[in-house]
Amino acid sequence: MSKMIRQKTDRSDCEVIANFCLQNDLRYWEPKSQTSKELHEINCRLDSLKMELNRLNNQLEKSYLNEKVKKSINEEMDFIKNQIKTLEIEAQQIVVQNKKLQRNFEIITSIQGVGSKLALAILADADFERFQNGRQYAAFVGVTPSHFQSGTSVKRKSQISRIGSSNLRKILYMNALVVKNRNVDFADFVERLQEKGKAPKVIIVAIMRKLMNIIYGMLKNNQKFDKSLAFGC
């Protein structure tokens, strides 16, 4: 919270900082490990490559392109696909060589419908140890509701916050679709949302949020998926 300060001295600055620390539950900042940095860098590069691949694919769909241009685009896309495959293998090797990452990878993928791509993206960009609860974890990924209201007349429809890694969120979305259609452990959860009249897309976002909450709890407790713990039944 900001304060009205009439003077600025080293002493007053120290008092403000000290009061802030006393009034807030702060955690020590810890730098990422070298392994985490490497995974993060690979994931960022993968994100860029996939965006470029999508751009080229959109360009390829234009009907007026001549054959030489199409050939050039296809060759570039093949090159990018090989780069993506190489980096994904490199990321997997980093995980296999680190016992903690390997264990966390196994924990995340113990949920039916959650694949290796999502697990790698989470390990690279969403370190659970930085957060105090599952809601914070889900908020970091950008799948918690965002509300906007000004006065009594301006009120927008709630939507997800979309902060965090867009690539992670895209992979999470695809995994949520698989979980909805194939994971029987989520059937009751989905059915309750449907009975409330929730739209299909809202249900998918709810599954995304639920997955991040469950994954946080699993990683925090070093435990693979257990339906009774995940859904409290």
Residue ranges and their predicted role:
Residues 104-126, 137:
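Helix-hairpin-helix
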Residues 121-196, 200:
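Phosphate-backbone recognition surface of nucleic-acid-processing proteins
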Residues 2, 30-40, 62, 156-159, ...:
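Short, solvent-exposed helix-loop connector elements
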Residues 152-156, 189-233:
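Low-complexity, acidic/Ser/Thr- and charged residue-rich accessory regions of DNA metabolism proteins
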Residues 1-107:
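Long, charge-rich intrinsically disordered scaffolds of nucleic-acid metabolism proteins
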Residues 82-95, 99, 116-129, 170-176:
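Amphipathic, charged-and-aliphatic alpha-helical interface segments
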Residues 24-28, 127-131, 178-185, 213-227:
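Short helix-capping/linker segments at secondary-structure and domain boundaries
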